[in-house]
């Protein structure tokens, strides 16, 4: 089988899709022809993978980038049997008007809500956003979301909440719930005088890292506990979190250590 995967991020970028897509691609490429199209901070002449990686530079004119991505999907999708959409959903929809290929789409949230919420253009939570009416521009984005989603042949979600979300949008195709997996490691008993916490996450508003910091600040003040929190990741909330850490007087307790990969990340566990 010939498979094309589209994603918004891929190593060396850090984030959920950048972890999931290579794992899936590594497995599928053993028995199938496979290519990946991704946005990237930089383009690389050589990628150390057993399948094709086609990178489009993220930081460029958005209209030009969109058109370039659509054309690349059309070019690389002509001979594929199926397109797995882990990102670039609107670009795939436009390209597939010409390609007419079967598609499987992974839904892990509402991309329209996430974008608006991350940019502080709305304050409503996920479920409120589905019920309320907004400006014409936002309603148009929701319409495009719904229309493109319903064009998929199969949708995969990691939770019942998201399954209900997809059903409520009127999707009539094949819908599968596959819960997120995790790496099982050997547990070790330790006796420590202090509490150590770890957050591994993209630094975006919807992750609610600010609530964790405020909660730990209250616990520290009430119970006088000593703790250390390492936050691994990068993203647009970095400066806001730095300011909050200073405001809550947690400079000695909380460290933003940036993005870490593989062995570097294991060190924090």
Each language-model region and where it sits:
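Conserved donor-binding/catalytic core segment of Leloir-type glycosyltransferases
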Residues: 4, 156, 189-207, 212-218, ...
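N-terminal strand-loop element at the rim of the active site
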Residues: 7-14, 20-64
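Carbohydrate-associated surface elements
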Residues: 161, 181
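Short alpha-helical donor nucleotide-sugar binding micro-motif in glycosyltransferases
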Residues: 77, 149, 259-260, 267-269
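Acceptor-binding helix/loop patch of EC 2.4 sugar-transfer enzymes
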Residues: 104-143
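Membrane-proximal helix-turn-helix segments that form the acceptor-binding/catalytic region
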Residues: 70-78, 127-155
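Nucleotide-activated donor-binding/catalytic signature segment of Leloir-type glycosyltransferases, i.e.
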Residues: 240-260
């Amino acid at each position: 089988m010939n498979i094309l995967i589209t994603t918004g991020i891929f190593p060396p970028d850090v984030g959920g899709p950048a972890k999931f897509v290579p794992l899936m691609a590594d497995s599928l490429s053993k028995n199938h022809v496979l290519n990946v199209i991704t946005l990237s901070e930089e383009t690389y002449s050589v990628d150390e993978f057993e399948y094709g990686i086609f990178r489009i530079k993220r930081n460029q004119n958005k209209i030009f980038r969109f058109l370039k991505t659509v054309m690349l999907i059309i070019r690389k999708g002509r001979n594929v049997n199926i397109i797995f959409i882990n990102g670039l959903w609107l670009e795939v929809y436009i390209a597939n008007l010409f390609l007419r290929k079967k598609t499987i789409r992974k839904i892990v949230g509402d991309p329209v809500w996430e974008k608006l919420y991350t940019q502080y253009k709305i304050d409503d939570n996920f479920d409120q956003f589905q019920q309320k009416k907004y400006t014409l521009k936002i309603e148009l984005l929701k319409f495009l979301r719904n229309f493109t989603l319903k064009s998929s042949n199969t949708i995969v979600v990691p939770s019942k909440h998201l399954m209900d979300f997809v059903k409520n949008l009127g999707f009539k195709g094949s819908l599968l719930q596959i819960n997120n997996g995790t790496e099982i490691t050997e547990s070790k008993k330790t006796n420590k005088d202090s509490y150590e916490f770890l957050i591994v996450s993209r630094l975006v508003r919807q992750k609610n890292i600010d609530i964790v910091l405020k909660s730990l600040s209250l616990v520290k003040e009430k119970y006088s506990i000593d703790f250390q929190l390492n936050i691994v990741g990068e993203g647009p909330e970095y400066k806001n979190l730095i300011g909050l850490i200073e405001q809550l007087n947690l400079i000695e307790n909380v460290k933003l250590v940036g993005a870490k990969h593989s062995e570097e990340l294991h060190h924090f566990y």
